[in-house]
C-alpha cells in the first residue's frame, strides 16, 4: 500500500480557503482518492484547546509572541502525530487548512519572530515533515480583511492592524517564490476562475503522482 499525500491550502483571511478546500475534496472524490481533513491550529481535541487559546479575544493577559508561536507548534505537533501521519501511513490523503507556512508568514513575517529560532522549533516538532504540495491563495490584505469583516466576528489575530497583515502578505509571497512545491493562485480573480485554477493544480499533482 502506498502512502498518502498531504495537500495544504494557505492564504490570508478572506482568501477563500474554505471554498477552495471544497474544490479539492470534489477533485479527489472524482479520482476515487480517500482523504481526511485537518485544520491548524486544531484538528485534535487537545490541539483544538490550543486553538482556542491562540484565537480567543477574551484573555485577561496579553499573549507574548513567544507564547503564540509555541502554542501554534504544540498544536501542529499534536495534529501531525495523532492524525496526519497515521492517515498518510494508511494510504489516505490529507487536506490541510494551513500548516507550517502559516507560522512562517504570521509569526515570522507579521510578528517578526527570529527565523533561526523558528527553524529550530520547527525541526524539533515536525522533524523535517513537509506537505507534498501547497496551494497558496494570494490576495491583497485590504481585500481579504474586508471579506473577513463581512463574515462577522473576528478572532484575536484577525483584529490586528493592517500593517501586520501587509507584513504577513509580503512574507507569504517571499516564501512562495522560494519553494517549488508551493503553487500560487490569484485569489482576487472571479471565484469560478480561482476554483478552476485550484482544480487544475490538484489534477496536475494527481497525474504526476500516478506517473511517479
Curated annotation (Swiss-Prot):
CDD domains: TMPK (cd01672). This is Thymidylate kinase. The gene is tmk. Phosphorylation of dTMP to form dTDP in both de novo and salvage pathways of dTTP synthesis. Gene3D superfamilies: P-loop containing nucleotide triphosphate hydrolases. It is an enzyme of class 2 (transferase). One of its GO terms (molecular function) is dTMP kinase activity. Keywords: ATP-binding, Kinase, Nucleotide biosynthesis, Nucleotide-binding, Transferase. One of its GO terms (cellular component) is cytosol. NCBIfam families: DTMP_kinase. The keyword Transferase applies. HAMAP family: Thymidylate_kinase (MF_00165). ATP binds at residues 11-18. The keyword Kinase applies. Its EC number is 2.7.4.9. The lineage of its organism: Bacteria, Pseudomonadati, Pseudomonadota, Gammaproteobacteria, Alteromonadales. Belongs to the thymidylate kinase family. It catalyses: dTMP + ATP = dTDP + ADP.
Amino acid at each position: 500500500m502506498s502512502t498518502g499525500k498531504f495537500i495544504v491550502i494557505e492564504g490570508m483571511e478572506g482568501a477563500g480557503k474554505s471554498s477552495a478546500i471544497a474544490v479539492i475534496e470534489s477533485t479527489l472524490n472524482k479520482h476515487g482518492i480517500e482523504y481526511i481533513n485537518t485544520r491548524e491550529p486544531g484538528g485534535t481535541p487537545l490541539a483544538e484547546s490550543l486553538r482556542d487559546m491562540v484565537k480567543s479575544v477574551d484573555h485577561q493577559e496579553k499573549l507574548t509572541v513567544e507564547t503564540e508561536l509555541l502554542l501554534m507548534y504544540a498544536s501542529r505537533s499534536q495534529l501531525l502525530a495523532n492524525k496526519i501521519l497515521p492517515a498518510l501511513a494508511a494510504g489516505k490523503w490529507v487536506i490541510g487548512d494551513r500548516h507550517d507556512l502559516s507560522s512562517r508568514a504570521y509569526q515570522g513575517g507579521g510578528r517578526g519572530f527570529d527565523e533561526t529560532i523558528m527553524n529550530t522549533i520547527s525541526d524539533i516538532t515536525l522533524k523535517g515533515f513537509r506537505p507534498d504540495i501547497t496551494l497558496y491563495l494570494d490576495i491583497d490584505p485590504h481585500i481579504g480583511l474586508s471579506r473577513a469583516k463581512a463574515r462577522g466576528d473576528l478572532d484575536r489575530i484577525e483584529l490586528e492592524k493592517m500593517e501586520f497583515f501587509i507584513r504577513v502578505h509580503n512574507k507569504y509571497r517571499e516564501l512562495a517564490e522560494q519553494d517549488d512545491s508551493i503553487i500560487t493562485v490569484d485569489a482576487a480573480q472571479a471565484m469560478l476562475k480561482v476554483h478552476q485554477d485550484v482544480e487544475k493544480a490538484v489534477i496536475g499533482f494527481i497525474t504526476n503522482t500516478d506517473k511517479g
